């Protein structure tokens, strides 16, 4: 068994997965850079999105938000409304997760889920309402929670 930074024991497979994720993070960073230089904006955005997902899987929500915001910028620049909605949702979810440690993050989560609701298709609007309901419930605002659920 190995020990991580918090003194928790990790199995060898957990350690391998973290090393593998770290390598993939570097690969996606390099891919985003290469795509940006080549003018392949859609692929650049996908690399940022994939990097955000990897950070989410590692529980590094602040870093994931940084990558999702880069993805959002690219989506706006190329007019990818579906990607923009996805980015708003991902950012909102991460702020919601960070709100469990710092309730001030719930305000950011509400902002991004509201933006998601504004640009999303019908299924996305439904998801945004569900997420807003969850946030308002966690904040103790049951009236707004019931409106969105």
Report residues per predicted region:
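Conserved alpha-helical positions within TPR/SEL1-like repeat arrays
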Residues: 7-17, 43-57, 82-97, 124-138
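Eukaryotic all-alpha helical interaction scaffolds
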Residues: 32-36, 55, 75, 113-116, ...
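Aromatic/pi-system hotspot detector in well-structured domains
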Residues: 31, 48, 67, 71, ...
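Flexible inter-repeat linkers and adjacent short helices
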Residues: 1-43
């Amino acid at each position: 068994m190995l020990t991580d930074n918090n003194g928790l024991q990790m199995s060898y497979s957990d350690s391998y997965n973290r090393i593998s994720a770290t390598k993939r993070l570097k690969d996606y960073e390099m891919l985003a850079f290469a795509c940006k230089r080549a003018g392949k904006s859609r692929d650049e955005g996908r690399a940022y999105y994939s990097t955000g997902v990897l950070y989410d899987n590692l529980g590094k929500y602040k870093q994931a938000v940084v990558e999702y915001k880069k993805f959002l910028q690219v989506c706006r620049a190329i007019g990818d409304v579906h990607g923009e909605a996805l980015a708003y949702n991902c950012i909102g979810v991460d702020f919601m997760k960070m709100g469990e440690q710092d309730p001030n993050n719930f305000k950011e989560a509400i902002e991004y889920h509201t933006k998601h609701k504004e640009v999303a298709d019908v299924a996305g609007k439904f998801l945004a309402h569900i997420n807003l309901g969850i946030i308002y419930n966690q904040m103790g605002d049951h009236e707004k929670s019931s409106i969105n659920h």
